[in-house]
Amino acid sequence: MSWDSYVDNLIAQSKDASGTTHCDKACIIGKDGSAWTTMPTSDTSNNLKLTPEEMANIAKCFKSKDFAAFMSSGIYVNGTKYQFLREEDSKLVLGKKKGEGSLTLQSSKTAIVIGHCPEGGQQGNLNKAVGVIAEYLESLSM
């Protein structure tokens, strides 16, 4: 099964009423730290590029529901450190880096959906789009 179409759907879901897209890149990883979407070899793809170490660290925090590592060391995605803003219900994590944009990470039963909002975009639209995909996966017991 190709999960890359879910990234395209997530990006489309982030559009506001004027048609502006508030998500430029996204990916889905498993709670076991595996890549579900294709990890691109360049930055030209809509898919976020995470290293195996970044995926493992993110998965570990969500699986254990312990976000202390994010609080103390930040959230690393594509080699960039994002400041941890908050977590909600051990399922949703928000991060931000000035000049880079913001991150929304939301887990389902077996997956973590990660979206990136470019600087100047509306993270609220990103949160909604990530939530739609994560909740859909949850409804499939995934």
From Swiss-Prot:
It holds the Pfam family Profilin. Transmembrane segments: none annotated. It comes from the Eukaryota. Expressed specifically in coelomocytes in response to injury. Its main location: cytoplasm. GO terms for biological process: regulation of cellular component organization. GO terms for molecular function: actin monomer binding. It is found in: Cytoplasm, Cytoskeleton. Keywords: Actin-binding, Cytoplasm, Cytoskeleton. SMART domains: PROF. InterPro entries: PFN, PFN_euk, PFN_sf, Profilin_CS. Gene3D superfamilies: Dynein light chain 2a, cytoplasmic (3.30.450.30). The keyword Cytoplasm applies. Belongs to the profilin family. Occurs in many kinds of cells as a complex with monomeric actin in a 1:1 ratio. Binds to actin and affects the structure of the cytoskeleton. At high concentrations, profilin prevents the polymerization of actin, whereas it enhances it at low concentrations. By binding to PIP2, it inhibits the formation of IP3 and DG. This is Profilin. It comes from Strongylocentrotus purpuratus (Purple sea urchin).
